[in-house]
Amino acid sequence: MAADAFLLIFGLLLTVLIVAQPLGSGLARLIEGETGTLLQKFETKTARFFALDTTEMRWQQYAAAILALNLIGIVVLFVLLMAQGNLPLNPENMPGLSWHLALNTAVSFVTNTNWQAYSGENTLSYLSQMVGLTVQNFLSAASGIAVAFALIRAFSRRCVDTLGNAWLDLLRITLYVLLPLSLLLALFFVSQGVLQNLLPYQHLTTLDGAAQTLPMGPVASQEAIKLLGTNGGGFFGANSAHPFENPTALSNIVQMLAILLIPTALCFAFGKAVSDKRQGHALLWAMALIFIVAAAVVMKMEVTGNPHLLALGADSAANLEGKETRFGVLTSSLYAVVTTATSTGAVNAMHDSFTALGGMVPLWLMQIGEVVFGGVGSGLYGMLLFVLLTVFIAGLMIGRSPEYLGKKIEVYEMKMTALAILIPPALVLLGTALALSTEAGRGGILNPGAHGFSEVLYAVSSAANNNGSAFAGLSVNTPFYNVLLAVAMLLGRFAVMVPVLAIAGSLVVKKRQPESKGSLSTRSPLFIGMLIAIVLLIGALTFIPALALGPVAEHLQFGLTH
């Protein structure tokens, strides 16, 4: 079993690294604005058609453009979901959503969270899935990558006050990266048996005479960008555990590759854009080491499972509850780590059915800000925030002015860094406290005790860190939870994005100092170790008390009870 786990983890990471390198080179060219003559003519015509201003933007203009696009997206999607009962491509006559569910869903997909307080096959029309959710999957992913592009330019440029053009970045990312990759991945999924049609649901009679309804729909096209864009919202309620979304072991492995592809490629792109590939490699080492340990722990917990089952006559103590037999314990455990280390939130097993400590690791991966690969764009700029914090602390320790890639890190950058790092944990802890201190919040808890607390903590952690996965034992389709989590998703996304762009705007105007003998090496094993330590320390100081009340207490209760 240990050998199988080793092969799964390292085989996945090795394949991702091989595939992501050429993509990273392409992304680096996009960061520098190198698109080629033919593509440049096409994007110029497209920009003219949409009347886009393609002049370079300062950070305030860049942030305003990103915020405006996302605000419009929330309004349009909200209206579409409310009105879907009166719109075409609705063969099952799905009614419009309630205002609070429509608000929650609109915010969820625009912020790249894809939290779902509904089951797609019972709630949404094909039009809502295609024109509403799938479009936002592209735009939210492009928004995150665009902000990462702006921050990378802040390090690669010097003595200018612009970060690029948000509209051109969004256009290029969508046309040259997300659409081609999604098309290829969707075709692969169709070859594996994922649905792609506009047929009405099929009503059948089984061999034993029972009635059965098989949902249909344009699944493969949404599934591709759901994974590549680290969105995670499933076409069906069971998400990637559903055989119409993830039918085979091969499709399951490819899904994990697709989730990790762009976050990994962005690290390579970062190194190439700043003319020091080892900087990108250092970030990847830090991410990969945390990922490997997290995956090993979850696999160990789920394989160990419940030893008391053996005394009851079970063939194995492994925790198979909530898992698909076509994937098994190890692959389901690895998928859980992949989807929570990134901001994806797609699931091929029910996280609520994991062991107490096995479920704690995905929860903790979200709580540290999803910087272990992270979401497309957001993972890179999230990890760079921790890099700046590490550089600052190291500078204090050795008595030197902190700098990163030749740019001095001063008071303003540290204020913005602290703000961006602390906002999501504050949202998690305050949101959980609010839910547990109100009748409306406690009313959604279906499981008493420590596990019920864990379900609330997981839900708010998932929303505030834009993940979207859930411990599904919590009843969240209520006005209280829909509004609470919508606010957490909005602030968790944009209250981090804006400080990141502010940091970029401050750094881009600075001179890039040459590296000297006294400069702190930010690509050495020592720095990688310090970076990992800072990430773990921030996570530990912030969340150990909450985790002790939830998963740890549940684990101890299990041991005492049995």
From Swiss-Prot:
> Quick check: keyword Membrane in the entry?
yes
Q: Where in the cell is it found?
A: Cell inner membrane
| Database matches in InterPro entries | KdpA (IPR004623)
Principal subcellular localization: membrane
What's its membrane topology? Multi-pass membrane protein
The organism's place on the tree of life at top rank: Bacteria
Q: What is this protein called?
A: Potassium-transporting ATPase potassium-binding subunit
Q: In which organism is this protein found?
A: Pectobacterium atrosepticum (strain SCRI 1043 / ATCC BAA-672)
